Amino acid sequence: MKSTVKKRGWVIAGIVVVALAALLYWRYAATEAPSGKAQHAGGRAAMRMGSAPAPVQAATARSEAVPRYLTGLGTITAANTVTVRSRVDGQLMAIHFKEGQQVKAGDLLAEIDPSQFKVALAQAQGQLAKDRATLANARRDLARYQQLGKTNLVSRQELDAQQALVSESEGTLKADEAAVASAQLQLDWSRITAPIDGRVGLKQVDIGNQISSGDTTGIVVLTQTHPIDLVFTLPESDIAAVMQAQKAGKPLTVEAWDRTNSTKLSTGELLSLDNQIDATTGTIKLKARFANEDDALFPNQFVNARMLIDTQQNAVVIPTAALQMGNEGHFVWVLNDDNKVSKHTVTTGIQNSESVVITAGLSAGDRVVTDGIDRLTEGAKVDVVEAQTAADAAKPERGERAPTDSARAAKGARS
């Protein structure tokens, strides 16, 4: 009896398990059927998409004059730098410049107390006047002695002595004249003037201080910035190109760009080339000169130098984005009239971040693919589309209304 009841319990449990399994399967099949259809439909759509021409962007190779530049790093240096010092000793009485001021050669910069130099000049002038009178008297005596000598009233010895006295007085007079000139020069040097055109820096000494000609710091440093120079370096491999460009007889144009190489500061000309290569760095120094009338360049400023050495005429130019690299070298995808692509191996020339010169393998007017290149195969047909601008991206899709001013305002308020 107990075994019969036990068997009946197992049968009932089995029926329940089978029923639950059937229910779960039915629900799973009901939910999977729509998604399976969707996946199947998506697969068919994907197949249709795969057979459509790949969208690409293209550009036309153009013919133009392309400049060739050599680039290097450099530092702006003053054309001349002078430490203005006093040539005489004395007390600094006045300063006649403002720090940072542009001055001309000969402008008064400072004054030393001139009192002692005026006194010395007066003494020298007095001595000169005295000795000039002495010389005049000696010459008159000599004239009388010469007259008396004709009648033998004076001896030859006395006549020679008087002649020597005149010569001595003449020598003394010349020494006095030199002393006067020296005293005048000392007085002139008490007025310190600018030796060159340039910009004065910060003053190194204040009014009232005792200064001397032996002071090494000087009164102020004067730098000539109109014109101003740029000293930059180029690799030794560029020397031949520079020398060849110089032999053409035309001045080489040099541009100074800022530290980030994004803004051109000024344009000048190559002034000179160093006579030896730096063996440590393998570079050579060059110097360019700039008028710098707008003061765009400043001494010790770091800049990027670009020197134009040649211009390639009628060069075939394409966007850099079109140039690709493969196992056989550089190549581009060229479009024919039917918008089918073919791979062309090319030889490149001058290149920058935006464009590249093609020296072989392409002609002006050829169309090259610039975007969508990764989907291309030889002979594939493509659909050339225009590059989407920011304004186009902001336009609403067809059937979608543009937001009104009130909607934009409400969105702005929520944000």
Swiss-Prot record:
The entry's localization annotation reads: Cell inner membrane
Q: Where is this region: Disordered?
A: 387-415
Q: Identify the main location.
A: membrane
Compositionally biased tracts (Basic and acidic residues)? 394-403
Keywords from UniProt, A to Z, are:
Cell inner membrane, Cell membrane, Membrane, Signal, Transport
Q: Which Pfam families match?
A: HlyD_D23
Where in the sequence is the signal peptide annotated?
1-21
* Top-rank taxon: Bacteria
- What's in the GO CC field? efflux pump complex; plasma membrane
Q: How does it sit in the membrane?
A: Peripheral membrane protein
Molecular function as annotated in GO: efflux transmembrane transporter activity
Q: In which family does this protein belong, per the annotation?
A: Belongs to the membrane fusion protein (MFP) (TC 8.A.1) family.
Oligomeric and partner information: Part of a tripartite efflux system composed of MdtA, MdtB and MdtC.
Its protein name is Multidrug resistance protein MdtA
As recorded in Swiss-Prot or TrEMBL, the protein's gene is named mdtA
